[in-house]
Amino acid sequence: MKNRVLKALTVGLLIVICSGCPKLSRAAELKPITLAEALDLVFEQNTSHALFLWEQELLEKREALEKHPKITARTEPAGVRNGKFAGPEGSISLNVPLGQYFELDGTIRVGFDEKRLDVKPTGSLTLNYNFFALPETETSERLAQQQRQAQVNTLVLQTVDQLVQLKKKLDLSKQEEAHLKYLEASLEAARLTPNYDDLDLRKDLRKQAETLADIQKELQQLQLQLGAFLGESEGALYDPQISTDVLELDLAEEELKEEVFASSPQLQEAKARLTRAQQELDLERKTRGWDLKASGDLNLNQSGPDPASSQPVNWKMSLTATKTLYPRNIVLEELELAAAQAEHDLEMQESALLAQLRTAVQGVRSARAMVQLKSEHLAEAQADLKLRHRQYEAGLVTELQVQETALALQRAADDHAHSKMDYAQRLLDLWNLCGRDLRSLVFAVIN
């Protein structure tokens, strides 16, 4: 008889635990959602992500145009020169970047005489070479790729965080609902006991009802936040389907440091600033402030100082050296200061990234240790429930004591599952710091 009662009690308790809160956790109202489904919704409907990709695409197109010839057209339909009407004129200018040191400029002008019968084309072509030009800065294609990856990883981390928060709160709601049922059963049993003072039980029951109401409010807020984040406006209530794995990883700091340094846009920018500052300082020391340029000009129908001796085609080559009369020691000191500041900024960036890496690695290790601890607690809770079953069969404990132990087991199981979720989030934080693609790696720990 006791075995049948105990089995019925256990089944009833599991139903209470799994049923969850009456408003937000019934299967008829909750919509199951997996991480893959949530990520698909986020990347399809997130406006900020779409605008970011659009901006990146436009930046890439503009950078590509910087390497192409630039053509400028100008027209002057009418004008007055020296009190006389001037005919219409027009010009087309061309600028062609030819690399680090060369630049080609050309202009073709077309005008009409007073009778607007004869076309007078004129033009010029200029080729410039700078002997002491600084090297061009490296393309920002890699930087743009890192920024896109950072944007994707941020969305993945936000999605995981929202799902985990909601999952934990739903589990807590089920725990507290089951605890409320337990207190109600305890109060009912107390009322059947003669002269039993149930004042504390009634206080606990009221307090538990208030706790459950607060959890309901928090659940509603989390559901609204998740719906807005996913771009869903139908007011659906979600039930995250999350299963996490604990990976056996060798977290070698030196290898991870290389990944972190290589994937940090801020560190790459700091390195570029230091390289530029050192180049400017080296150039100043080498040239002592002189700038040397060579240029060649080819002119068509350009009027010279003596119109009678003007030729249809004229050309000129020149070498120009310029120097700004400014105290050289001050210039050198300014450049040395800029290089020292850039070097200090780089060292600070590396130190900050290394501190973040060590914190992230320690977070993963601590979370892994917590999973192990919660696993031990779960095993102890399972052993406690088995012991309670044997004690109940021997008539040593009551049904309520068995129910209380079953509640402790459910709490230990949820704590163990939540510790694995925390571990997954800490590992994702570490991978994000290393610049890895979380869109695919996330399913290695969450499925």
For each of these PLM feature ranges, what is it?
Residues N82-A86, K115-L117, S303-P307, E399:
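Outer-membrane beta-barrel proteins
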Residues R328-V331, L337-L373, H377:
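C-terminal structural cap/anchor segments
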